[in-house]
Each structure stands twice: as structure tokens, then as C-alpha cells.
Amino acid sequence: MVSFSYLLLACSAIGALAAPVESEDTSFNETALHEFAERGGTPSSTGWNNGYYYSFWTDGGGDVTYTNGAGGSYSVNWRNVGNFVGGKGWNPGSARTINYGGSFNPSGNGYLAVYGWTTNPLIEYYVVESYGTYNPSSGGTFKGTVNTDGGTYNIYTAVRYNAPSIEGTKTFTQYWSVRTSKRAGGTVTMANHFNAWSRLGMNLGTHNYQIVATEGYQSSGSSSITVY
């Protein structure tokens, strides 16, 4: 979780941002919370909230406030940040059908995406629903397209070398599906993306977490998302 590297030369990333959590502790570290509160930010944390897995990571730059809401809802407000990513979903991930809605308003670089990891092989994946000033279609290796959920997604791969991951510093592959028409609500049929990737030789492993994530890099903005 640090840097879109190859795919985003100027962007640090949703990738490797938050390691999985073994417990279901939903509380933030009080000392860290106090320290970040003085700077107007929320500390990094992962866990469970109202029946959903959540992950929030920040490099500590700028001002970013992540708030877990009722059910599958969360909100993020950020100003002049370095890099952060956060959201709600499930652990483990699966080929589920995801419904979500809300608002996503970045000023600068940002993503709204279904984001997750698998192990054996170690894969970091994104189904990008919307983005800010940087279009991830600009980078990576184009593999094909998939038509699903009322839109077309371009499929890409990229490789991260010696980068942070849920297994520590590793070299691993990223899989991307990037929607050509931006949106901030609807249905994401993950089985259709996974099947399309598989047909292209892009195989997944054992699922770790899977969230509907908001990410920002050197930008400002706001996001309010509910996962169903």
C-alpha cells in the first residue's frame, strides 16, 4: 500500500496499503488517535465495524478524516494529503455481487474502486469505478475488455517490484479493470471480472480482504459511500 508504481508513476497507492487484521477489534489506538487529532487526521486502522470489514491507511501527510458509519457506510474528507486509502467490505473477498452508492468528489488524484488481495499467487486487484485527474488506463499492459453491469471495463496488468504488500515487501502483479464511464454507485459483479481475468490468463489465489475503497494521492476531496 504505497505507490501505484508502474501504473501510476506519480501516484502512491491503494496497493499494499493495509495488512490484514486477525482480530475483530473495532477501536482505534487511543494514543495514536490523540496524536492525529492534533493534526486533524485519523490514524491507520483495520478491523470490523457493524458487520463489515474496514481498512484505513494513511501516510500521515495532510489532513484526512475517515469515519465509519452505520452498516456498510463510511465517509472520507481530505485536504492536501500525501496518500491514503480506506473503505468497507469483506474479509475474505469472493466473486460476490457488490452493490454500493454514494458520492465521490476528488480534486486531483483519486480512485473509487473495489480493491482486494489474494495470496498464492500474491495479487493486488482493482475494479475502478471512478477516478480523478489520473486515468489508470494511461499505464500498465492492456489485456482486453469486459462488458458488465451496464458498462465497459478496460483490463490491464502491472508489476510492482519490492513493494509493500500484505505479505511484507514483495514483487507481485496488479490486476486492473477500469470502467470507461465513471460512476459512484451501482452493481459490480465481481464474478464477471474474475472470469474475464481468468480467460486472459490472469489467475487469482486465496482471497484476503475486499473493500469498496476511496483513495487519494496529493489531492483534496470528499467521499461518502455505502456498501450493501
UniProtKB/Swiss-Prot annotation:
Cleavable signal peptide: 1-18
Classification via PROSITE patterns: GH11_1 (PS00776), GH11_2 (PS00777), GH11_3 (PS51761)
All copies of domain GH11, residue ranges: 40-228
Residues carrying a glycan: 29
InterPro entries: ConA-like_dom_sf, GH11/12, GH11_AS_1, GH11_AS_2, GH11_dom, Glyco_hydro_11
Function: Endo-1,4-beta-xylanase involved in the hydrolysis of xylan, a major structural heterogeneous polysaccharide found in plant biomass representing the second most abundant polysaccharide in the biosphere, after cellulose.
Family assignment from sequence similarity: Belongs to the glycosyl hydrolase 11 (cellulase G) family.
Protein's name in the database: Probable endo-1,4-beta-xylanase A
Gene responsible for this protein: xlnA
